[in-house]
Amino acid sequence: MIISTIAAQRRALLVFALTLAIGGTRFVTQAWAAGAFAIGKCGAYGQAYDYSAEDAARIAALKQCKGECTAVTMKRACAALAIDMKNPCGPHGYAVRPRISNSLNEATRECYKFGGKECVIRAWACDAKG
């Protein structure tokens, strides 16, 4: 009888520990899933990902970007910047999408839409869930 009680306590403790581990992983992933991408002139950019808050990510991305930059935030997503290789200070495009492939394709499409001739991806970033 004593052995089965000890075994039951151990099983209960194991289940409790696994529940905490799974729940803790979910909390950490959600808590650190904000990012930002700053876009400037002539291919300048800044990126920040896996921050606890969008404002903190935006500030960090803008700090990395040279000159006047515009920041977009991403939460559980990816961002990409495409520039025209023939004219890096000319047409560019950026996108924020749930999947990296979609953001890369859309950024390139936007670059061509604004007159780019040889658009290439300059930079990309994803947060924890993107």
Predicted segment positions?
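Bacterial N-terminal signal peptides that target proteins for export
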Residues: 2-16, 24
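Secreted/extracellular ectodomain signature
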Residues: 2-6, 28-130
